[in-house]
Each structure stands twice: as C-alpha cells, then as structure tokens.
C-alpha cells in the first residue's frame, strides 16, 4: 500500500514543491490503513483483481488524509499531533495544509478516473459516485458539520449514531464497497451482507475511538488524548459511560461477524479486521 501511495502522489521535487511535500507528509508514513485493508479484504471476497483494488484503496486513503488535515486545523479541532508527529499545519503552515487537503481530494478522483476498475463505463461511474457521496455533505463532510454544531450539546444515542454514520462510517463503508465492486464474485444478497458488515464496523470504529480517547495515552494514540471531553463533544462514552461503550463495541463486532456468516472461510480477513477495529489499543 505504501508503494502505491508513493507512486500516485506527486513527487516532492515537482512544483509547487512545498505543497507536494505537505501532501506526502500527510498521507505517508503512519496510520492504521484500516480503510485500504477493508478494500483489499472485500476485493478478495469478490474475486477482484488486486491491481484494481490498489487504486481504490489509495483513493480512499487520500480522501481520509485530506479529512484529517482539515479536521486538525485551528478552525476545526485545532490539534497539533497526528499519527505521532506534528499535524500538517504545524509542520508546514495553515494555508499550505488547507491547500494540501484541497489537492488530495481531487487527486483521489483523478486516479479513479485514470484506471480501468470495472467491467463497464457505467459501473466505473457508479464507483466515482460512491466515493463522492461518502466524502461530501451527505457523508464525511456532513458528519463533521454535525460534529462541530454539537459541541457542548447533549445528543441522544440515535443522534450520535447519525453523526458518526456520516463522519466516520461513510468512508469506511465506501472503502469496503468499492473494493468489492472491483470484482464480480458477489450475488446481490451477498453484497447486501457486505454492506451491513461495513456499516457495523464503521460504527464500531467510532465507538472504540471514543473509548480510547478516554482510556489511552497520547503516546499510544499518536494524537492528543482526552480532546473530546476537553472540548465538550458528545461521545459514546459521555452518553453511555465507559463500560457500556465497551460493551456496545463488542455487540457491534458480533453483528459484523454475523453478517459474514454465510461466507465461511472466504471472509476470514474481514472478520480479522472487525476484531482488530474493536480490540485495538490505538
């Protein structure tokens, strides 16, 4: 995956050099790579060509990296640490960081458009649409808007879930679905099960993030711990308490496994990823 990202990103010596260095700084050398791993695992289940999945995985990771750059800016979460190193706007400057995020988003769609990923033009256009919807106001960006508007407010559990279905879950679902769409090995009912799995692990990822924000150190997380409570953000922990939030993560893991049950051993990697998402310590 790292080699693919290196290949798709602009070389640092190409003008504008500072912008390209910032883009590479934000994308390379860190992160769990959960979204690309989901793309590859779903692609394997759907008998997809790994070369196609690699393109999808890189595009999704670029969208994710752009979102992190913007989330960390002073006008949003105002964070100074990401993946164990200074955030992009700290390492470079705020304007360069903003532009790096702005440039990564269209680059993701550029590489999707430049490669044959599906067996028909219509199917490939649908893949572009899936990533666009997951990234925009009806997906990740919309979830961030809800998040910013919710600071200092008491949300109900359904309201919190709606926020994270958009903010975190949308791109995780897109990563999984796009990996599978690179292949043709799934029947419609199997695809529905995969989508159910993706929605469930997307929520589980956020529940665990909320738990770790309370329960892990900054050194372990590679980002500032305790930020949610300090900023009075509604979280699964603030609504449910730590023990109940942990239990919810386990319930979601069981749901994810259940969605995959008809696939048997073919879905082993997807099960492993559900386990990692819930059991991780960072």
Residue spans for each PLM region:
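Mg2+-dependent prenyl diphosphate-binding active-site environment of isoprenoid biosynthetic enzymes
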Residues: 9, 13-257, 268-278
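N-terminal amphipathic/basic leader segments beginning at the initiator methionine
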Residues: 1-10
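Short cytosolic juxtamembrane segments of multi-pass membrane proteins
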Residues: 281-282
């Amino acid at each position: 995956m790292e080699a693919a990202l290196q290949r798709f990103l602009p070389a640092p010596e190409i003008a504008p050099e500072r912008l390209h260095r910032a883009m590479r700084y934000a994308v390379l050398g860190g992160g769990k790579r959960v979204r690309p791993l989901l793309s590859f695992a779903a692609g394997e289940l759907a008998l997809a060509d790994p070369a196609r999945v690699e393109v999808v995985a890189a595009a999704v990771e670029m969208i994710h990296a752009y979102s992190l750059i913007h989330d960390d800016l002073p006008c949003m979460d105002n964070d100074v640490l990401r993946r164990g190193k200074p955030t992009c706007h700290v390492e470079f400057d705020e304007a360069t960081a903003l532009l790096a995020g702005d440039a990564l988003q269209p680059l993701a769609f550029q590489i999707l458009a430049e490669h044959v990923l599906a067996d028909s033009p219509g199917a490939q256009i649908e893949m572009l649409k899936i990533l666009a919807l997951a990234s925009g106001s009806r997906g990740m960006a919309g979830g961030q808007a809800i998040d910013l508007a919710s600071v200092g407010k008491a949300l109900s559990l359904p309201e919190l879930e709606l926020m994270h279905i958009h903010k975190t879950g949308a791109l995780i679902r897109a990563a999984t679905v796009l990996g599978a769409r690179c292949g043709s090995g799934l029947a419609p009912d199997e695809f529905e099960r995969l989508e159910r799995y993706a929605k469930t692990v997307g929520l589980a990822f956020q529940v665990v993030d909320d738990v770790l924000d309370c329960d892990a150190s900054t050194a372990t997380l590679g980002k500032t711990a305790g930020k949610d409570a300090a900023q009075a953000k509604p979280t699964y922990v603030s609504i449910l308490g730590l023990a109940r939030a942990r239990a919810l993560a386990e319930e979601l893991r069981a749901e994810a496994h259940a969605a995959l049950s008809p696939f048997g051993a073919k879905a082993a990697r997807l099960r492993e990823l559900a386990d990692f998402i819930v059991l991780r310590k960072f």
